[in-house]
Amino acid sequence: MFKLGKNSINNMAGIDGRLIDIADVAITLSNIDFGIPSTGGLRSEADQAKLFADGVSKADGTINSRSYHQSGKALDVYAYVDGKASWDKLHLALI
């Protein structure tokens, strides 16, 4: 059985408590270890704009294109495979 690490827990600061509860249960049921990346939780408008500029997000963070991350209503995860983060869809499907 897996459990969320200290960094993943810290990366969920400011997120809706219901999402935290879901992540806590999901990690115990998952077939593969996973974590929450540093940009996977609550984001400021500036953080969101940078992710958009880097091509990582489709939402630019402005009033017309806000991300649910900006209100704490979204959480990103990565699969933890062979000692490193993976965003491979095959790995993510196992979570």
Task: Indicate residue ranges for each PLM-predicted region.
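Cell-envelope/glycan interface and biosynthesis
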Residues: 1-95
